[in-house]
Amino acid sequence: SAGIVKKAGFTGVQIHGAHGYLVSQFLSPLHNQRNDRWGGSIENRMRFVMEIYRAIRKEVGPEFPVGIKLNSADFLKGGFSEDDAAEVVTALASEGIDLVEISGGTYEAPAMTGNRMAKSGEEAYFMGFARKIRKTVNVPLVVTGGFRTSDAMAAAMEGGEIDMVGLGRPIVVDPDLPNKILSGQPY
């Protein structure tokens, strides 16, 4: 499908490795109970996403951007942890992934919709993990989840903690939001 996307004129493709979908299930020790080469250790559990990435890269070539949306953690007891996520990001970075979008949670434990700001004291939910991973890999980072003001978005980018801000729900509510922010309107 990545080859079809490229032929159709899209400018990149993203693997959805978050929120409890199939790739995320392979990565999670809670959901992945396999006892073969696809389960157990983080090396085995990430084999699925690594093979997907390699197949996509082979299909689209080195110049076509390939990214991944990945949980920083799934926030389930015995599930995918920040340490697991750091290993996956490091492995993908070593293979040439072009972008990592950091999110978190599953539909069982929806951190991407909860009020983590009150706990962390900061607006965006996953900035702590972004800071941690920024120190170990040189890959463009996106954080999605919890940004509610243009000041927080600007501070995260100007501080070099992330390279892009991911917006989902705010743009559904106001499709012209990016233009408003760029024109200096408060958000």
What are the roles of these predicted feature ranges?
Residues 1-187:
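Flavin-dependent oxidoreductase catalytic cores
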